[in-house]
From Swiss-Prot:
Binding site for Mg(2+) 1: 248, 260
Gene from which the chain derives: rimK
Reported cofactor(s): Mg(2+); Mn(2+)
Matching InterPro entries: ATP-grasp, ATP-grasp_RimK-type, ATP_grasp_subdomain_1, RimK, Rimk_N, Rp_bS6_RimK/Lys_biosynth_LsyX
Binding positions for Mn(2+) 2 per the UniProt entry: 260, 262
Record NCBIfam families: PRK10446.1, rimK_fam
SUPFAM superfamilies with a match to the protein in the record: Glutathione synthetase ATP-binding domain-like
Free-text comment on the cofactor: Binds 2 magnesium or manganese ions per subunit.
Residues that coordinate or bind Mn(2+) 1: 248, 260
HAMAP family: RimK
Name of the molecule in the record: Probable alpha-L-glutamate ligase
Lineage: Bacteria, Pseudomonadati, Pseudomonadota, Gammaproteobacteria, Alteromonadales
Record Pfam families: RimK, Rimk_N
ATP-grasp domain ranges (all copies): 104-287
């Protein structure tokens, strides 16, 4: 099969692993810089151009779209969908996952476990917003933040008020969530491919830190999922419409709760922690599912 990886940096671990794994299985794999793609959308024969040439017909596209280029990146994915190319994650699903509020609303509608959450831009009563999620300690997040950036733990109601007022001064949209103290600074990353959790790792925050992101110094280890945790991860991926994603779960007193669904999860941490060939499992999925016009939205959304 001929497969394209959309990635801005061919030297990233995940990009390199996907290329190596694909070629090891006999596929022809091209790495394409998403931002250097440009599209012909005026004709009845949609194409994607790159480096002055029309790109060839691909059997599948693996989007590795960074959050900073979501708008343009999803437009490129949508163009491939319009051409009938199978995209591992569809443009609509990627867009959903990048909108934290929309993601939580979709998960809530499906009855998937979530931390108590409030959303605000200019709340008239900050105290009521804080009270509504159970009071301090609580977590305040910028909607646009990634890798733990723009996430603050407020230990007291007064501190929470100050942080919310500061974010309001920046005209930022914020989420206010209950702090799951019983998780002990740890979360579980479930790597979903198709309808299976193919790998899972537990990430423990560094000492004195509540964010477990590996970019923040967290450490990862192999973990065995409970039946509820596995079901929660699969239901979250299904609700978002993602074939490939990382679902981050906290273990609360009320069962597993979803913190985030990542449509472009990194491979380095999960492969090193579990010893699994996750990149190869992604190609197994592609080999089974990649057919012309197999996308559900087919570029319509």
């Amino acid at each position: 099969m001929r497969i394209a990886i959309l990635s801005r940096n061919e030297n990233l671990y995940s990009t390199q692993r996907l290329k190596e794994a694909g070629e090891a299985r006999g596929h022809e794999v091209d790495i394409i810089d998403t931002l250097h793609c440009y599209m012909d959308i005026t004709s009845s024969n949609p194409t994607v151009r790159y480096m002055g040439k029309v790109l060839p017909k691909y059997d599948a596209v693996i989007p590795r779209i960074g959050s900073s280029i979501t708008f343009y990146g999803t437009a490129v994915v949508r163009q491939f969908e319009m051409m009938g190319t199978f995209c591992v994650n569809e443009s609509v699903a990627i867009s959903r996952s990048r909108d934290k509020l929309r993601s939580l609303q979709l998960l809530s509608r499906k009855g998937i476990g979530l931390p108590r959450t409030g959303f605000a831009s200019k709340p008239d009563k900050i105290q009521d917003l804080i009270k509504n999620v159970g009071g301090a300690p609580l977590v305040i997040k910028l909607l646009e933040g990634t890798q733990g950036i723009g996430v603050v733990l407020a230990e007291t109601n007064k501190a929470a008020e100050s942080v919310i007022e500061a974010f309001m001064g920046l005209k930022a949209n914020i989420l206010v969530q209950e702090f799951i103290k019983e998780a002990g600074g740890a979360d579980i990353r479930c790597f979903v491919v198709g309808d299976k959790v193919v790998a899972a790792m537990k990430r423990q925050a560094a000492e004195g830190e509540f964010r477990s992101n590996l970019h923040r110094g967290g450490v990862a280890q192999l973990v065995r999922l409970s039946k509820d945790e596995r079901a929660t991860a699969l239901n979250a991926a299904k609700a978002m419409g993602l074939n490939l994603c990382g679902v981050d779960i906290l273990q609360s007193n009320n069962g597993p709760v979803v913190m985030e669904v990542n449509s472009s999860p990194g491979l380095e941490g999960i492969e090193q922690a579990t010893g699994k060939d996750v990149a190869g499992l992604i190609y197994e999925f592609i080999e089974k599912k990649a057919k012309p016009n197999a996308n559900r939205t087919r570029g319509k959304g």
